[in-house]
Amino acid sequence: MSQPITRENFNEWMIPVYAPAPFIPVRGEGSRLWDQQGKEYIDFAGGIAVNALGHAHPELREALNEQASKFWHTGNGYTNEPVLRLAKKLIDATFADRVFFCNSGAEANEAALKLARKFAHDRYGSHKSGIVAFKNAFHGRTLFTVSAGGQPAYSQDFAPLPPDIRHAAYNDINSASALIDDATCAVIVEPIQGEGGVVPASNAFLQDLRELCDRHNALLIFDEVQTGVGRTGELYAYMHYGVTPDLLTTAKALGGGFPVGALLATEECARVMTVGTHGTTYGGNPLASAVAGKVLELINTPEMLNGVKQRHDWFVERLNTLNHRYGLFSEVRGLGLLIGCVLNADYAGQAKQISQEAAKAGVMVLIAGGNVVRFAPALNVSEEEVTTGLDRFAAACEHFVSRGSS
């Protein structure tokens, strides 16, 4: 008989790059999770904007099981039907002409940055290698993507870092304009900075970035790893802004909990990537592709996307009511079901403590830095689940405030 698994085993056996919650989830259904002791949680964290259709969605399980009964993997020496169907769905639904599949958002961003460098080198020469990114961004944990992220806390211990990456202030076109020039090969930007505090870009900022990239023959990359696949109420956030990138990265919700990532590209950009210039062993495997194809089928409908906008209103209305009572937040911001509650000055730096109180009360939330409590629930979360979860969150806020004043 195997020994019982406990949270303490994590501290004994795992490389300690995470500090997970004190409880271990063991079962999920929809927007609810249960831990080893049977305690129920309403899940407003969504696996960090991954579980777009909640836990154990029956149609995703069916898609996975059906493919699992056929074959799992062949490697990139062969293609498969599920990945080709998935590619066509993404092409039909977006600006893209071609797709590269991988396993995560970091891999998708790595591929985008490599493509941008090669595109510039092939067309203009090796001097055109500069990448402009933004402070407080997050693009992944590879050495290339963590360097683009603009958060020294994630990169300072891994020097020397890749060169020719500079960081402008987000939503500040003058700051960006000072860095973008004819030696710039790409600008990479999140339409909403997720890890950086749930900060939406302004329309003018993204439009001006598009114009600057066109003027200097640089590619515009939208990192939609967190904002993509219905999260904002459009299939991809660029559709809100009327600004079309040259490259777009997507992952997280694309697999609904199954690891998958993708780089979407125009034909002009894609043609520089020839056989052997990039690759991955597992990318586009039939299991991931079958699940992602079903995710897109379920999410890319007017009913689902309009429902996200409606659910945004449910959350914002109730969070504002809660805030009127407890006075924790200076702002509630975001698009669709990516929502950030910004702590006011009296509670600065205490987002983690609030998230811990929330878990005790039976609701799971995220943070985005020390000052923002973040919500990224399933896109199909019910009104009853929203009400129950936010009632629990209100109880957590009440306990947090009373504890601080006692």
UniProtKB/Swiss-Prot annotation:
<dbReference type="GO" id="GO:0019545">
    <property type="term" value="P:arginine catabolic process to succinate"/>
</dbReference>
<comment type="similarity">
    <text>Belongs to the class-III pyridoxal-phosphate-dependent aminotransferase family. AstC subfamily.</text>
</comment>
<dbReference type="InterPro" id="IPR004636">
    <property type="entry name" value="AcOrn/SuccOrn_fam"/>
</dbReference>
<dbReference type="GO" id="GO:0006593">
    <property type="term" value="P:ornithine catabolic process"/>
</dbReference>
<protein>
    <recommendedName>
        <fullName>Succinylornithine transaminase</fullName>
        <ecNumber>2.6.1.81</ecNumber>
    </recommendedName>
</protein>
<dbReference type="InterPro" id="IPR050103">
    <property type="entry name" value="Class-III_PLP-dep_AT"/>
</dbReference>
<comment type="function">
    <text>Catalyzes the transamination of N(2)-succinylornithine and alpha-ketoglutarate into N(2)-succinylglutamate semialdehyde and glutamate. Can also act as an acetylornithine aminotransferase.</text>
</comment>
<dbReference type="GO" id="GO:0043825">
    <property type="term" value="F:succinylornithine transaminase activity"/>
</dbReference>
<dbReference type="InterPro" id="IPR049704">
    <property type="entry name" value="Aminotrans_3_PPA_site"/>
</dbReference>
<dbReference type="GO" id="GO:1901607">
    <property type="term" value="P:alpha-amino acid biosynthetic process"/>
</dbReference>
<dbReference type="InterPro" id="IPR005814">
    <property type="entry name" value="Aminotrans_3"/>
</dbReference>
<comment type="pathway">
    <text>Amino-acid degradation; L-arginine degradation via AST pathway; L-glutamate and succinate from L-arginine: step 3/5.</text>
</comment>
<dbReference type="InterPro" id="IPR015424">
    <property type="entry name" value="PyrdxlP-dep_Trfase"/>
</dbReference>
<feature type="modified residue" description="N6-(pyridoxal phosphate)lysine">
    <location>
        <position position="252"/>
    </location>
</feature>
<dbReference type="Pfam" id="PF00202">
    <property type="entry name" value="Aminotran_3"/>
</dbReference>
<dbReference type="InterPro" id="IPR026330">
    <property type="entry name" value="SOAT"/>
</dbReference>
<keyword id="KW-0808">Transferase</keyword>
<dbReference type="GO" id="GO:0019544">
    <property type="term" value="P:arginine catabolic process to glutamate"/>
</dbReference>
<keyword id="KW-0663">Pyridoxal phosphate</keyword>
<dbReference type="GO" id="GO:0042802">
    <property type="term" value="F:identical protein binding"/>
</dbReference>
<keyword id="KW-0056">Arginine metabolism</keyword>
<dbReference type="InterPro" id="IPR015422">
    <property type="entry name" value="PyrdxlP-dep_Trfase_small"/>
</dbReference>
<dbReference type="InterPro" id="IPR017652">
    <property type="entry name" value="Ac/SucOrn_transaminase_bac"/>
</dbReference>
<dbReference type="GO" id="GO:0030170">
    <property type="term" value="F:pyridoxal phosphate binding"/>
</dbReference>
<dbReference type="InterPro" id="IPR015421">
    <property type="entry name" value="PyrdxlP-dep_Trfase_major"/>
</dbReference>
<keyword id="KW-0032">Aminotransferase</keyword>
